[in-house]
């Protein structure tokens, strides 16, 4: 939305947006300098800095882009088999000789963390009772439809596509699993943040203003129409609308009010503070992708989650005044 609203230009920036296939590709392109900045899962900056699954590359974030936005989707076949919630899923798993397969978008993303939390809360061991596989978000629904997955945890609109097609149904929304969890951040290399500090702060300021725009209910239709365009999410408008207008359709007649399904600005969403960093680290440790918490010191966490950059961007935005 920052590009569509000319917010980058307002802050003197020329920005080119690139769509990428998956989160690992985005991480690698940041590491090797093919991208200057990226919309990325909150755990990615920590993982890149520590060299978890990649070359160690110090990265930072000065902006959390949103909270929540995900759901756990199960296949329609599981519904036909009698699954209605986590408890009945656990019972069915106990009768199967082969483990069920569930998709997550990235090893270091909230989707992996949230699905594991939901499974554990329902007495299902994510490492022994089921099989978790990494699949790019846009390919989740196709794999569910083809029968390769029994379920997945992913962001919208990939859950709503399953509901609309009656190939799947949602059993949980992410805010019910971990209230106010950080979702995506703006990720850059540390050397970019240092060497091009004025540009970086301006970038954060432009995106912060865009986040505020997206959070206003009266702007949601414009956001939906923009996301539906081929160069962006390229998904049906009705699928995008299902989670963006204050309610959420879980499927099979269950429609509930969810005003906080997507939070882009309110509730202190945008500050990359210590609480959000701690949640990500806790989830990384619990999921096993961070083998030893002592690998990362408190000072390193502060170098990654940069409230100083966020504060500078807020000051710049306040000085310029809102334009939308």
Enumerate the language-model features and the residues they cover:
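Short gly/pro-enriched beta-turn/loop segments at secondary-structure junctions
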Residues: 180-181, 222
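Inter-helical turn/loop segments and adjacent helix faces that build the functional surface
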Residues: 125-130, 194-199
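C-terminal non-catalytic accessory extensions
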Residues: 307-324
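Secondary-structure end/capping motifs
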Residues: 197-304
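Short, conserved secondary-structure transition motifs
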Residues: 136-142
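Short, glycine-/small- and polar/acidic-enriched structural segments
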Residues: 1-127, 133, 150-160, 167-180
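A bilobed periplasmic-binding-protein/Venus flytrap-type ligand-binding module shared by bacterial periplasmic
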Residues: 70-82, 181-198, 213
């Amino acid at each position: 939305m920052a590009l569509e609203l000319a917010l980058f230009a307002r802050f003197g920036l020329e920005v080119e947006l690139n769509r990428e296939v998956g989160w690992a590709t985005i991480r690698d392109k940041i590491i090797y300098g093919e991208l200057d900045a990226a919309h990325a899962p909150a755990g990615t900056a920590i993982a890149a800095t520590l060299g978890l699954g990649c070359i160690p590359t110090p990265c930072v974030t000065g902006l959390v882009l949103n909270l929540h936005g995900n759901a756990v989707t199960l296949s329609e076949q599981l519904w036909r088999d009698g699954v209605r919630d986590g408890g009945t899923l656990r019972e069915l798993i106990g009768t199967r000789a082969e483990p069920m397969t569930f998709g997550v978008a990235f090893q270091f993303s909230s989707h992996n963390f949230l699905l594991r939390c939901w499974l554990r809360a329902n007495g299902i061991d994510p490492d022994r009772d089921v099989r978790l596989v990494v699949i790019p978000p846009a390919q989740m629904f196709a794999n569910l439809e083809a029968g390769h997955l029994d379920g997945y945890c992913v962001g919208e609109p990939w859950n709503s596509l399953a509901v609309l097609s009656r190939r799947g149904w949602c059993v949980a929304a992410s805010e019910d699993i971990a209230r106010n969890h950080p979702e995506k951040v703006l990720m850059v290399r540390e050397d970019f943040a240092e060497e091009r500090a004025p540009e970086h702060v301006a970038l954060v300021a432009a995106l912060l203003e865009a986040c505020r725009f997206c959070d206003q209910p009266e702007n949601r239709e414009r956001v939906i129409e923009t996301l539906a365009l081929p160069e962006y999410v390229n998904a049906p408008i009705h699928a995008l609308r299902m989670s963006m207008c204050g309610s959420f359709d879980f499927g099979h007649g269950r429609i509930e009010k969810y005003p906080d399904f997507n939070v882009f600005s309110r509730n202190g969403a945008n500050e990359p503070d210590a609480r959000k960093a701690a949640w990500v680290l806790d989830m990384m440790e619990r999921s096993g992708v961070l083998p030893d918490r002592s690998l990362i010191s408190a000072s390193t966490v502060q170098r990654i989650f940069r409230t100083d950059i966020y504060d500078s961007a807020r000051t710049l935005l306040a000085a310029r005044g809102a334009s939308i």
